[in-house]
Amino acid sequence: MVPFSGLTAVQMAFMADRVMYYIEELCRRCGAAVDFEYWRKITKRVLEGLADRKPLVCPARAGSGKSTWITAFLLAACELRLNNDPLADVFSVLLVLQKIESLNGIRDTIADFFTNAPETLVVPLQGWTAASQKAGFCKNKQVTSFDQCRKDNCPYAASCDVLRFGQLAGQAFVLGVSQARFDLLRKGNALDGLLQQVENAHPRILIFDEKFEFAPIYRLTQTTLDAASSQLERLITQRDLKDRRVFEKQRWTTTLLRRPFSLLREHTCIELDETTKAKADIPYGRCSLVDADNAEKERFGQFRDYLNGPGRAFRTPALSEAVEVIDRLYRGECLFTKLGAFTILGADEPQISFGDSLTLVFDATAQVDGDYQYLDAEMLPASKPRHMEKLCLHVYTSADMNVSRLAMRKSWKLPGFCALMEDILRRYEGKMFLTTYKDLAAEIPKLLDPQALSRLLLDGETCPYFGGTNGSNEFNTASLVMLLGYPRLSPQTYLERTFVYWGHSGIRQQIWDQTAQWSPLNVQKRPDLHAQLPLTMDYEVRHLAARLEQEIYRCQLRNAVCDEAVHVFLFAPPQALDARLGKRFRGAMSVHENLTPGCIVQAQANAKTYAGQSTVYARFAAWLSSWDRAPTPLDNILRDAEIGTESWKKLRKSGRFAPLLAQYGAEMTGRGRNVKIEEKSQKCA
């Protein structure tokens, strides 16, 4: 076979024109608008990549037309294939999407354009899912879960599209898989069969609509080992195995996996006192089984080879993970951490290329995301940010505005921020997208007044929460965005990911150096990773910037047309994070609020107690909050709020009294026994 040297200029121009044609047609059908010149440039570079095979990362912003381009590129490619154009012989496509529903949707779209296409044109490879049954691929309505699928033994097997897709996968011109399936096949070393179409000498183009895990990470914990045993136990009923055979494998895991794990758990400690033999955990460092007995290594090797060969049916997900880590420990050093539960980390080097395939990854935040920092890939141009003239970032810098998980546990925080939310909704028009921590998402709607609640975009009956809105376009009517929290990972996770993804930065040597410095004097202190390993802080800032940008772009900014001003509210972000976000939204207005809002100050005061009782300020504020606006004699107020005369006098003299009255639009009138609280004719803003 003559080596492929790339498309000619004429061929690339022709293909690019067909992609542009389909982009225009798709935009016409759904009323969308995209930057055609930008996508023409991206198309040209992708086609050039068929020759050099250098992996490409496209940082097209959210809402810029990524999904439209992917569909248009596939339509143009399928048109070539159906017309028997020689261009279609130099590539095929492996499409990796997050959701099965999206795969099925693209298949339907292509079928609408090419009604009589062969079944091998587009194949969405999938197991049983609710989506596959909804699409009519599974004909057995009695099956309601993946575990119930009997595959070839099902009475509907002959007409099952799910099984048929598996049979057609190798022949498919466009083969679609979910990201979860791709990761599973990759970890199981079973990916090679998908990288090339049968009877096509050239490898597939791999298109990912979102970032995937470039470095498969394996974690060995006590939970992993327990899960391995439980999953083996379930095989007895799932695969009708004899208990004796499963018990034999569980016994092997005790000897070959649990025992070395427990040994390392014990050895990753420092003795504090020779007399009492008291010990303390080493927070993090390196461990290994290289010096283990050769007989143990050999027994483990036999077990590993058995699971990879004749015993593959017993290789459950948790057992596979445990075996991967132990195998690495016998071959060299691994990172361990005790910042949480004892964890041993096994990971491959980050990889974005597979075989000779051209890889194209779409990721709107790739330019800021730390996972790309040391990745060997070409970063394509970003699309121009849209609607920046409409955007205003409101950044509250006061320490009282801290919205970390720990800070939000304070009793006054949630009521205070709900009051601030109501104030924002009074000042600005439009719907609000608020995202927060999962445990707060259900509480916020309960604390808002009905008018404010009616303008809050909910996910069911709760607010959206971090990690629960991935890929969602459901909030693109919002013109107000409130980020009540930060989607931080655990310190242990940041340490692990920096270790894996920033290996070329020197982080691994820093960790090894720190390992040698642990002593009885410092090992008992809570480790300050940001001080000991500054690179972990840099990685964390990049991660947060990428995640927050994703959340901000769920509003009207992602739309082709943005008629309203967009206001985004951030609370006490770290300075480095604030700076990175500012660079990502160049052209937007930025307002830094240095003072603590009055409603937050009041919420703090309301929560204060003295000798177990509410303070005078809190009691008077509570009375004002339920006041019916009718003129009320002071004597009645003091009686109802249980405030003594002397306490009232002290409150009157305090600097907080006048602002509290102003907040509720109240004033004091009269003298002596005729003093009243009345509503002002004009309230303060």
Label every PLM stretch briefly.
Residues 1-685:
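ASCE RecA-like P-loop NTPase motor cores
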